[in-house]
Every structure is written in structure tokens, then in C-alpha cells.
């Protein structure tokens, strides 16, 4: 099995890249792809860049050029569900765009034409992520992860997302685009991210401070999953 791993920023992929052996680096457009082995498993690791378009470009490059069997999106997210704290793990059951609106034509909020209302994560990958989180003794929550091209720092924007998507667990800027591309190509995916901030008025300061912690936590989750993927 070849495992695709996607992170937006250097901080979100550098630990895994550092563990990779027989590593080859490819720069394709805005995407950086590291190809090699991690703990004996065949891995292609994408640093996509930030935002939905960069994530979609990179994921398309990954799927077309390197043909992974599954995709895991790793990195950080802003916690929205009550009780989530920095370092907690969120696992996607589904993803949606919080900034897409074609409701004038009868679509659900966040739904684009010719697409489902949400992109469902692979149930086996979701269950594996939950198993690893429990095995590692982590606080974890499964649910809807919403994506958009804005860093959410509380206020009206966060309130609107909660109103539009009551089950929302966490927010970030790439997952739904990655899921969209995986859906289009028929590749199973899951999002496994660690909370770096609470998506509130202190989010910017919290994100800068806690990103390294979130990156380490999500990386440890991915390594646990790699050990059991066959």
C-alpha cells in the first residue's frame, strides 16, 4: 500500500519528512512532494501550501502523479466543539466548505453543484484514527470539519459558521478541498488534525504559539496509523 499524507505548511510535514528514508523531493507547480519510506511503509508526503486552491492543486498532483491508495490530511485546526483544548485530536467523519453558498439554486449551505453536501471520510480510516487516538491516550473528537479561505478568529464569522453548520467540530483552510479531490478520484481519505487554537479572538496568538505542539501531536497520530495500514 502507498499512503498519501497531506499537510499545508512546512511545520506540518517537516517531522514526517525528517523520518523518511530513500527520500526523493519533487517540486511540481506550487506543490512539494516527498517520496520514500517511513518506518518501512511506502509514503508520498505533500506540502500543499495554505488554502483551498493550493490544497486542491497539490492533492491532484499527488493523486495523478504518485497514485497513493489512501490519503491522510494532517496538521492543525481551530477547535469549535465545546470542550476542545489545544493538543486534542479531531478526526473527520465528513468535511464541508463553510464559505460556499449556492443556496439560491436549492443547494445546501456549503454544497457546490454536482457535489454532495459534505464529503464523507472513509469509515475504515476514521475507525483506525480513533483506535490510534485511544491507544495513544489522546483526547479525541470525531465530526464535521469545515474549511474556508479565512483564518477564523471568533466574532461574526465564527458565529455564522456555527449557525450554518451546527455539528461543526473544527475549522481550518484545506480539508474540504483535499476531500473534494479525493472524492473526484475515488481515493479514500480521512482528516486527522490537532487543535492549535479555539477559533476565537485569541486564535492568532494561540496558533503561533501552539502550532509546533499541534504539528507534533498530529504527526504522532499519523505514525500510529502508518504502523497498522497494510
From Swiss-Prot:
Keywords: Amino-acid biosynthesis, Hydrolase, Methionine biosynthesis
Any single Gene Ontology cellular-component annotation: cytosol
BP GO terms, sorted: L-methionine salvage from methylthioadenosine; L-methionine salvage from S-adenosylmethionine; nucleoside catabolic process
Matching InterPro entries: MTA_SAH_Nsdase, Nucleoside_phosphorylase_d, Nucleoside_phosphorylase_sf
Protein EC: 3.2.2.9
Active site (record annotation): 12 (proton acceptor), 197 (proton donor)
Amino acids binding substrate: 78, 152, 173-174
GO molecular function: adenosylhomocysteine nucleosidase activity; methylthioadenosine nucleosidase activity
Pathway note: Amino-acid biosynthesis; L-methionine biosynthesis via salvage pathway; S-methyl-5-thio-alpha-D-ribose 1-phosphate from S-methyl-5'-thioadenosine (hydrolase route): step 1/2
Catalytic activity entry: S-adenosyl-L-homocysteine + H2O = S-(5-deoxy-D-ribos-5-yl)-L-homocysteine + adenine; S-methyl-5'-thioadenosine + H2O = 5-(methylsulfanyl)-D-ribose + adenine; 5'-deoxyadenosine + H2O = 5-deoxy-D-ribose + adenine
TM stretches of this protein: none
Function statement: Catalyzes the irreversible cleavage of the glycosidic bond in both 5'-methylthioadenosine (MTA) and S-adenosylhomocysteine (SAH/AdoHcy) to adenine and the corresponding thioribose, 5'-methylthioribose and S-ribosylhomocysteine, respectively. Also cleaves 5'-deoxyadenosine, a toxic by-product of radical S-adenosylmethionine (SAM) enzymes, into 5-deoxyribose and adenine.
PANTHER family in alphabetical order: 5'-METHYLTHIOADENOSINE/S-ADENOSYLHOMOCYSTEINE NUCLEOSIDASE, 5'-METHYLTHIOADENOSINE_S-ADENOSYLHOMOCYSTEINE NUCLEOSIDASE
NCBIfam families associated with the record: MTA_SAH-Nsdase, PRK05584.1
Family affiliation: Belongs to the PNP/UDP phosphorylase family. MtnN subfamily.
Protein name (Swiss-Prot/TrEMBL): 5'-methylthioadenosine/S-adenosylhomocysteine nucleosidase
Species annotation: Actinobacillus succinogenes (strain ATCC 55618 / DSM 22257 / CCUG 43843 / 130Z)
Amino acid at each position: 500500500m502507498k499512503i498519501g499524507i497531506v499537510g499545508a505548511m512546512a511545520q506540518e510535514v517537516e517531522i514526517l519528512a525528517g523520518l523518511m528514508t530513500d527520500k526523493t523531493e519533487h517540486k511540481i507547480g506550487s506543490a512539494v512532494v516527498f517520496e520514500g519510506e517511513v518506518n518501512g511503509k511506502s509514503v508520498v508526503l505533500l506540502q500543499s501550501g495554505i488554502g483551498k486552491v493550493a490544497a486542491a492543486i497539490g492533492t491532484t498532483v499527488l493523486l495523478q502523479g504518485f497514485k497513493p491508495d489512501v490519503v491522510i490530511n494532517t496538521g492543525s485546526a481551530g477547535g469549535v466543539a465545546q470542550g476542545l483544548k489545544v493538543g486534542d485530536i479531531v478526526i473527520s467523519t465528513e468535511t464541508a466548505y463553510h464559505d460556499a453558498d449556492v443556496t439560491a439554486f436549492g443547494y445546501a449551505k456549503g454544497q457546490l453543484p454536482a457535489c454532495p453536501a459534505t464529503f464523507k471520510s472513509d469509515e475504515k480510516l476514521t475507525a483506525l484514527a480513533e483506535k490510534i487516538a485511544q491507544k495513544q491516550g489522546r483526547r479525541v473528537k470525531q465530526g464535521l470539519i469545515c474549511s474556508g479561505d479565512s483564518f477564523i478568529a471568533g466574532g461574526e464569522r465564527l458565529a455564522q459558521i456555527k449557525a450554518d453548520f451546527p455539528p461543526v467540530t473544527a475549522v481550518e483552510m484545506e480539508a474540504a478541498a483535499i476531500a473534494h479531490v479525493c472524492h473526484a478520484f475515488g481515493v479514500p481519505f480521512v482528516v486527522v488534525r490537532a487543535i492549535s487554537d479555539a477559533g476565537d479572538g485569541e486564535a492568532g496568538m494561540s496558533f503561533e504559539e501552539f502550532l509546533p505542539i499541534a504539528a507534533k501531536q498530529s504527526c504522532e497520530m499519523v505514525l500510529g496509523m502508518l504502523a497498522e495500514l497494510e
